[in-house]
Design a protein with these regions (language model features):
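A structured beta-alpha segment of the ubiquitous adenosine-cofactor-binding alpha/beta core
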Residues: 157, 202-248
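Short, well-ordered alpha-helix to beta-strand connector turns
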Residues: 176, 200-201, 224, 273
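Acyl-CoA thioester-binding alpha/beta core of soluble enzymes
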Residues: 1-186, 214, 218, 222-223, ...
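Glycine-rich phosphate-binding loop and adjoining beta1-alpha1-beta2 segment
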Residues: 177, 181-208, 212, 216
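Domain-scale recognition of functional cores that engage charged ligands
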Residues: 166-167, 177, 192, 206-208, ...
Length: 417
């Protein structure tokens, strides 16, 4: 953001970040309150890790109804945790992983980090950088739109779901971008996450199974600066929205592309989430060794670190690409995956064991009160965490509250010159 501000004004700003507040932002949904009542987390009762045969563990991801139905169909049981526990105990963990994926579900076998390092997908991820920012087409250099904030006038199409991708667009919005979130009315959603990541955005429904809605999206692309998408490789491409096609529609566009396991390797098209990546890559196994729970076994991070850090890195990548477009022109592709960020996070190392004793489970009430703000949304008064990054000339803020999905029409607001 500072680089973009310097391109606008020739000045750089002073940046301040409270690291404890930044840590809280990795579990921001925990602190949501609607009309002073905590917003439920929506976690499904059967989602989690279970002992399988031969001393191994399996994880099933069940927050979305279709993924839950797929897992339960494979297991042949109803939505009951005891029944799921008994069923998974009869399965080989690797065979269950493959069966659930084949059925259209999400989950995986708990691996060690050493096992993941030898897995074909783990090796593919190891050959990639944290993210890639590549020029995919030539076009003239473009000055940033006029405005008083780093991203004023920059239009962002947000075709992402869950946490990471929506966090990217939310971050761009807090620095002045005009964000239009596009999702399908037919797609399942998770209420709390939408409340948490919807700040600063317009929201509209389009059904890309319908030709007329595809044309509407094409029209929106022609007037966009950033196209952020979080579907599995090929999903939008099959509807005519490959990065190259987007660059033809709108020369100079920045395409931000997120998936679970990267564009490389045998799992390139496999669905996945933060917790799935933790499971298969050895993170939950190692967490279980360092922080054993009441029942021995794998443990997840206490925050959604991979999801949120991926979102922040996507926003960083988009900003870098916009700066390059300003200086040298061109259309740009920012490519990143949850698995790449998970690997990068593990490479940061571990906190020494001596520093892991007597760690508080929560921030103080006084801290949380300082970090919170209240927004008046169409469905009530929402208390949530405020932006973390402090900039000396252009304070970060959202100029719109979170709204229900599909609240607006799929059109760009008129821009003032």
């Amino acid at each position: 953001m500072n680089d973009l501000w310097e391109l606008r004004t020739g000045r750089r700003q002073k940046i301040a970040i409270n690291t404890r507040q930044a840590t809280a932002s990795l579990r921001s949904g925990t602190y949501l309150k609607m009309e002073d009542t905590p917003v439920p987390n929506g976690r499904n009762v059967v989602m989690g890790t279970y002992p399988a045969k031969h001393g191994r563990w399996s994880y099933i991801h069940c927050n979305f109804p279709n993924h839950r139905a797929a897992a339960l169909k494979v297991l042949g049981v109803a939505e009951d945790r005891d029944a799921v526990t008994k069923a998974i105990a009869q399965w080989d963990a690797l065979e269950l992983e493959e069966a659930i994926i084949a059925a259209g579900g999400a989950g995986g076998m708990v691996r060690t980090m050493a096992e993941w390092a030898q897995h074909p997908q783990g090796m593919a991820i190891a050959g990639l950088p944290l993210m890639e920012i590549v020029k995919i087409a030539d076009s003239p250099a473009e000055p940033l739109p006029k405005g008083e904030r780093p991203l004023s006038g920059v239009r962002v199409l947000d075709l992402t779901r869950v946490i990471a991708g929506p966090t990217c667009a939310r971050t761009l919005a807090e620095h002045g971008a005009e964000v239009l979130k596009i999702t399908g009315k037919h797609l399942p959603s998770l209420g709390r996450q939408e409340y948490d990541t919807g700040h600063g955005k317009l929201s509209a429904h389009l059904d890309l199974r319908e030709a007329k809605d595809v044309e509407i999206l094409r029209g929106l692309v022609r007037k966009a600066d950033v196209f952020s998408q979080g579907y599995r490789p090929g999903t939008l491409g099959n509807r005519g929205f490959t990065p190259e096609a987007l660059a033809q529609l709108r020369p100079g566009i920045v395409v931000v592309s997120l998936c679970a396991f990267s564009h490389a390797g045998p799992w390139a098209s496999r669905r996945g989430f933060d917790t799935v990546v933790q499971t298969v890559s050895g993170i939950t196994h190692r967490q279980g060794e360092v922080f054993p729970g009441a029942v021995p076994g794998p443990q997840f991070y206490p925050v959604s670190a991979i999801d949120f850090l991926t979102g922040y890195l996507m926003a960083f990548g988009a900003s870098v690409a916009l700066a390059r477009r300003t200086r040298e022109g061109g259309s740009w592709l920012v490519r990143i995956s949850l698995a790449q960020v998970g690997r990068w996070l593990v490479q940061r190392g571990e906190v020494p064991a001596a520093e892991l004793t007597n760690v508080a489970k929560e921030f103080t009430p006084e801290e949380l009160e300082r970090w919170k703000m209240t927004s008046n949304t169409p469905v009530g008064r929402l208390q949530h965490l405020a932006p973390v990054v402090q900039m000396s000339e252009t304070p970060a803020y959202w100029d719109k509250p979170t709204v229900p999905l599909g609240y607006h029409q799929p059109v760009w607001p008129a821009q003032t010159s």
